[in-house]
Amino acid sequence: MSSLYKPFCVSEGPCKDAILRRGCAPLQHPAAPTRIPSPGGGSTRTFTPIPNIYPGQRTLAAAAIGGRKITHPWKAIFAGGIAGGIEICITFPTEYVKTQLQLDERANPPRYRGIGDCVKLTVQYHGLRGLYRGLSSLLYGSIPKSAVRFGTFEVLSNPMRDATGRLDNKASLLCGLGAGIAEAVLVVCPMETVKVKFIHDQCSLRPRYRGFFHGVREIIRDQGVRGTYQGLTATLLKQGSNQAIRFYVMNLLRNWYKGDDPARDMHPLVTAMFGATAGAASVFGNTPLDVVKTRMQGLEAHRYKSTMDCAFQILKNEGPLAFYKGTVPRLGRVCLDVAIVFVLYEEVVKLLNNVWRTD
């Protein structure tokens, strides 16, 4: 079979622990020592061959990880894409409100008095569908973003797991950082730039963009491909720290819950609770970066010379509390987002393991 489907080679050794691994090879006893005469007719020397304790070595696509198999990268990509698509359809209204409040700068007379007022005015003037304006741009980005995130995390984490499949907490932090950087460069920065510009445009008196693809064409025509990578530095910092915190907290809680029994199953409700906790931790950890990123990707991005200049102007003109604008709606959205994504991801992987064999 192609090496693409068998990227990891694992040796199956003897079952020394109380927890038996499938396909374990029996322990072989060492061979008897052999006496070899020394050159020149002197005394003999004793040679003991080194036994092959692990004869059952073969290539595997998966090894036991806490009661489940190592997730094949292609399964992770597929499951991550499905989870990301479903999640964004559920949580987009909170993302819309968060973006609106962040774009509602204090320098101008504020349009909204708070979350409730933002929702009320949006529904009043645009109906319930108004809360889903800009969904297409985020949906097109959420599916590949989640796919890249989980695929990259599995590629990086699988070789770092121990014999029982447990991933060290520090390793999960590094793997999460790598996953966040990958999704930022490949998906998040261009798609988030388009999303913010699209939502901002729809709130103007005379919207220019008739749809997602028309908006992309207009942005590229006016600003080039570089126009879709505005705020790359802020996005790298935000996504890298985001996923590092989330995967670290999630892995920390998972290891604590399973304790000395890596085969212990996690109920979806437990996964959801751990995911919500990881999401909350990431919100308080990097909301300032999210605010700067949103400003750098908005239609007024030309006002800022760089990411640092944007942060300095926000601090100078609006004060430190401006870095936490939209925290409450973002907290609710992210907790729900991360909980849903982790639950859906785990369940889809279980389903794929039943219908898609990679060993």
UniProtKB/Swiss-Prot annotation:
One GO cellular component term, please give it.
Answer: mitochondrion
Solcar repeat ranges per the UniProt record: 71-159, 170-256, 266-351
Keyword terms, alphabetized? Antiport, Membrane, Mitochondrion, Mitochondrion inner membrane, Repeat, Transmembrane, Transmembrane helix, Transport
> GO MF terms on file?
antiporter activity; citrate secondary active transmembrane transporter activity; tricarboxylic acid transmembrane transporter activity
Catalytic activity, as annotated: (S)-malate(in) + citrate(out) = (S)-malate(out) + citrate(in); D-threo-isocitrate(in) + citrate(out) = D-threo-isocitrate(out) + citrate(in); citrate(out) + succinate(in) = citrate(in) + succinate(out); cis-aconitate(in) + citrate(out) = cis-aconitate(out) + citrate(in)
Query: What happens without the gene?
Result: Morpholino-injected embryos display altered tail morphology, impaired swimming and defective touch-evoked escape responses. Neuromuscular junction development is abnormal and motor axon terminals show short and erratic outgrowth toward the muscle fiber with no evidence of complete synapse formation. In addition, knockdown embryos often show edema of the hindbrain, heart, yolk sac and tail.
Per its UniProt record, what SUPFAM superfamilies does this chain match?
A: Mitochondrial carrier
Q: Where in the cell is it found?
A: Mitochondrion inner membrane
What kind of modification does the protein receive after translation?
Answer: Possesses a short cleavable presequence, which, however, is found to be dispensable both for targeting to mitochondria and insertion into the inner membrane. However, the presequence is required to keep SLC25A1 in a soluble state and thus in an import-competent state. Mature SLC25A1 lacking the presequence is prone to aggregation.
- Chief location bin: mitochondrion
**Mind telling me which Pfam families this protein's record contains?**
Mito_carr
| Membrane spanning stretches | 77-97, 171-191, 269-289, 336-356
Membrane topology type: Multi-pass membrane protein
Coiled-coil blocks: none
**Does the record carry Nucleus as a key word?**
no
What is the annotated signal peptide range for this record? none
Q: Does the keyword Ribosomal protein apply?
A: no
Gene Ontology biological-process annotations: mitochondrial citrate transmembrane transport; neuromuscular junction development; regulation of mitochondrion organization
Which PROSITE patterns does the UniProt entry name for this protein?
SOLCAR
The record's function comment reads:
Mitochondrial electroneutral antiporter that exports citrate from the mitochondria into the cytosol in exchange for malate. Also able to mediate the exchange of citrate for isocitrate, phosphoenolpyruvate, cis-aconitate and to a lesser extent trans-aconitate, maleate and succinate. In the cytoplasm, citrate plays important roles in fatty acid and sterol synthesis, regulation of glycolysis, protein acetylation, and other physiopathological processes.
**Family label:** Belongs to the mitochondrial carrier (TC 2.A.29) family.
This protein is called Tricarboxylate transport protein A, mitochondrial
